[in-house]
């Protein structure tokens, strides 16, 4: 299973292509006196676990907002990519803008310090980028900076040290060259899965921040391609589509039918440190399940599915498909607490003192492919549950109607991708 996800954040004037020298402003004062580099290199335990609850809360708040506005549509995004990008941006935000970003991401700054937040992301990104058997996860960021603007050394140093961001200085007036530079970098880092991410840029942009996630994982129990056949998928009461349906009927899996909620939950493992939860609402109950989809509910299901009595032999039917999601974040995030960031009231003076910056446009794109071997990009899958007669007592799971999917990093307790598959034939 492979996952790829990209986020492009454009701040007013943030980009250009040239081979000139990058001007770093050493004399300017940052709005924060704390040294994230020194703080983050110390610490004990697993700092990423401290930020996991807030990251999960943001994931489900973002999902609920999208789902409420686009009923009947596929959804797919990487909350981790969005959170990491904006947490990095907060290094250059000051006063109310900095607190709005961090609190908008779900962090309670009276319980968790800013240094704890950045330490958590540093540990999280480092852990996810470690090589693993059968699992490849790559998370990265890049800053494309105008060579005509002087950037504060502390902001650049912290983004490189904490978020391992790569810096590119460019001539922003060379629009064609700048777009080519960004797209070539994204294409390379995403193994060719995302091409032509940027099609146009305004010349008042001074910086572009790009964050991406590439996730490629193999099923712990793969499907056999010769057993994949066309089957019906019931989008709604009036729409049925044909999809290539994979089959697995000799394996045991972790699944349950929730006795308190109208849904079934399946957990499937990938090789390495990742797992996926497929949540199948009963017919007509999708909205009811979406309303109770919280970090606490996900942990409840996860804890239940550790019990041996939920490990059962299944006849499993899962569609082979590709979906994607694209979101204009500057229209979404203000409703999640980022009230001033995309306005003239934004304070990004921790990036440069030379001139005032505003966040102009922010985009997020995620793609997912699911096949017999695993998944590429971000993943979502749907299934229905059905039982044979009492005489056979055999369990069948059919992913043949809309469902929810959560891809999860076990060691960091992080939601990597979250989505809903309504129509697996729609990209």
UniProtKB/Swiss-Prot annotation:
PROSITE patterns xref list: SERPIN (PS00284)
Keywords assigned by UniProt, alphabetized: Glycoprotein, Protease inhibitor, Secreted, Serine protease inhibitor, Signal
Tissues of expression: Expressed by the liver and secreted in plasma.
Record's subcellular location: Secreted
Domain of life of the native organism: Eukaryota
Annotated positions for site Reactive bond: 388-389
GO CC term (a single one): extracellular space
Family annotation (Pfam families): Serpin (PF00079)
Glycosylated residues (UniProt): 33, 108, 157, 238
One Gene Ontology MF term: serine-type endopeptidase inhibitor activity
Signal peptide as annotated in the record: 1-20
Keyword presence, Secreted: yes
Principal subcellular localisation of the protein: secreted
General remark: Heparin blocks kallistatin's complex formation with tissue kallikrein and abolishes its inhibitory effect on tissue kallikrein's activity.
Subunit architecture: Monomer and some homodimers.
Family: Belongs to the serpin family.
UniProt protein name: Kallistatin
Designated gene of the protein: SERPINA4
